[in-house]
């Protein structure tokens, strides 16, 4: 974050694209839709789309808070991706480039922590103010299995980095939340947030970077420090595009699309 959000109407279009099985790196995912519907029949009913999203996540309500279920379709899809990733990472860790230190890169929102409850609270209508208010009062739960995968990678000798589009002002909130739900709290050298006021010199695009430029440029910077990024994990195409990773893993997220 910050992130350009889809309107409620576009949410329906994005979810419909996911249902049609758009794929990236071998995993189904939501994509933006450019064509203009010719009639109402081309647009999924928004209530139905939201209900489908809730069913996919196995919506469970406790004390007014919405949680994804560990036996949901979402959790099962994640488990398959994570099992494949662990197998491939285990092989990569045995065949790292000479002299390079192995590393994995994780996005934060809907890759490391789950925004599902927040999205339902705000009607899938992200604003910086509502997001900050949420982070001030609550922690987002870990994405099923990703905390264990990160810990496993660290135990196997890989360094874990996070690259997020969240603003620099949310650094303390992000570190607190990650640590609270099972991740090893990252220091400043291992957690990259978007600093529009003082962008790093290694990003030529500075404050005007697109998400792809910012994230791929930051991965290039990590490589320049002597790391081999053997796995890059994200829930958006823009988390993964631009190279500078040996393998990329697309996690499911039908709630929104970020270019």
What are these regions (language model features)?
Residues 110, 146-178, 192-193, 235:
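Substrate-recognition element of Asp-dependent hydrolases with the DxDx(T/V) motif
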Residues 120-137:
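A solvent-exposed, charged loop/short amphipathic helix patch at secondary-structure junctions
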Residues 38, 64-76, 132-140, 161-166, ...:
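Second-shell loop/turn segments in exported
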Residues 100-115, 162:
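Asp-based phosphoryl-transfer active-site loop
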Residues 84, 88-95, 115-119, 149-159, ...:
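Structured segments of extracytoplasmic/periplasmic soluble domains
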Residues 2-106:
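Non-catalytic pre-domain segments flanking phosphatase-related domains
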Residues 33-44, 72, 171-259:
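C-terminal cap/substrate-recognition subdomain and adjoining C-terminal extension
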Residues 80, 84, 100, 133, ...:
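Extracytoplasmic/secreted proteins, especially bacterial periplasmic and envelope-associated proteins
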């Amino acid at each position: 974050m910050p992130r350009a959000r889809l309107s409620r109407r576009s949410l329906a279009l994005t979810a419909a694209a996911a249902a049609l099985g758009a794929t990236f790196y071998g995993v189904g995912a939501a994509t933006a839709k450019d064509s203009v519907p010719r009639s109402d029949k081309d647009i999924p009913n928004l209530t139905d789309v939201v209900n489908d999203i809730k069913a996919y996540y196995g919506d469970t309500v406790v004390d007014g808070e919405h949680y994804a279920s560990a036996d949901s379709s979402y959790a099962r899809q994640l488990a398959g991706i994570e099992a494949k990733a662990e197998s491939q990472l285990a092989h990569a860790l045995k065949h790292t480039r000479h002299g390079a230190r192995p590393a994995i890169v994780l996005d934060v929102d809907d890759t490391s922590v789950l925004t599902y409850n927040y999205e339902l609270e705000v009607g899938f209508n992200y604003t910086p103010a509502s997001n900050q208010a949420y982070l001030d009062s609550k922690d987002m739960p870990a994405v099923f299995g990703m905390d264990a995968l990160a810990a496993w990678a660290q135990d196997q000798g890989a360094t874990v980095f996070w690259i997020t589009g969240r603003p620099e002002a949310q650094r303390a909130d992000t570190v607190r939340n990650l640590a609270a739900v099972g991740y090893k709290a990252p220091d400043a050298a291992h957690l990259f947030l978007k600093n529009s006021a003082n962008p790093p010199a290694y990003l030529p695009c500075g404050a005007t970077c697109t998400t792809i430029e910012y994230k791929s440029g930051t991965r290039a910077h990590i490589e320049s420090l002597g790391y081999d990024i053997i796995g890059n994990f994200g829930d958006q195409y823009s988390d993964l595009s631009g190279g500078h990773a040996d393998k990329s893993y697309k996690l499911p997220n039908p709630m929104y699309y970020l270019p």
